[in-house]
């Protein structure tokens, strides 16, 4: 539910237009209407930055294996959602190829994007766009992977909002059974 956001060519309604349409239909019923805005508030405000670990060529497909995984951004796997993926620094010294952008957790569902035309090399940073809504709240520690840091960017200033988890964070609260 809630208002959607633009991932590709979608045209979700503007909040004002959406509210007006609902009010016009339901105003005479005397109802209290509560609306969950969904991704409209934060969806396009967040980007997941990931590094290309290596490029893998199979007979029928190319893979860009990155250091982020489905546990960091579940929407592509869970909803077959499209997230625009672009190089942080475009380059002209790499050939353009079509890649599936996949994570390192060795699951068939561990992908962030399929069939993406990218000119990339190992070590490049990729921006997975529109990752602001529910990215962290849907993330997990699957395969004992610490969750990513969250950084707020305000103009030229950055602020650490949430530190990257450590393995110690993952073990916190666990107890060893008595001998």
Regions found by a protein language model. Give the residues of each.
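Glycine-rich beta-strand-to-loop/alpha-helix junction loops that act as flexible
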Residues: 1-6, 37-39
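A generic structural signal for short coil/turn motifs at secondary-structure boundaries
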Residues: 5-10, 137
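Conserved N-terminal phosphate-binding loop of PLP-dependent enzymes in the Aspartate aminotransferase
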Residues: 13-14
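Alpha-helix-loop-beta-strand connector modules within alpha/beta enzyme cores
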Residues: 18-30
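Charged (often Lys/Glu-rich) extended helix/loop segments that serve as interaction or gating elements
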Residues: 30-179
């Amino acid at each position: 539910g809630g208002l959607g956001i633009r991932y590709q060519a979608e045209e979700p309604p503007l909040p004002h237009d959406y509210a007006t349409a609902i009010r016009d239909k339901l105003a005479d019923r005397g109802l209290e209407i509560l609306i969950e805005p969904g991704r409209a508030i934060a969806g396009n405000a967040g980007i997941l930055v990931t590094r290309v670990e290596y490029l893998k060529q199979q007979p029928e497909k190319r893979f860009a294996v990155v250091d982020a995984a489905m546990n960091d951004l579940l929407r592509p796997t869970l909803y077959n959602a499209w997230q625009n993926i672009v190089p942080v620094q475009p380059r002209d010294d790499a050939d353009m190829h079509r890649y599936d952008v996949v994570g390192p957790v060795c699951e068939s569902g561990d992908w962030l994007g399929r069939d993406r035309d990218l000119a990339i090399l190992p070590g490049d940073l990729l921006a997975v766009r529109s990752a602001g809504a529910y990215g962290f709240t849907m993330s997990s520690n699957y395969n004992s992977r610490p969750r990513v840091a969250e950084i707020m960017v305000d103009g030229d200033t950055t602020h650490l909002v949430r530190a990257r988890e450590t393995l110690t964070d993952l073990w916190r609260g666990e107890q060893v059974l008595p001998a």
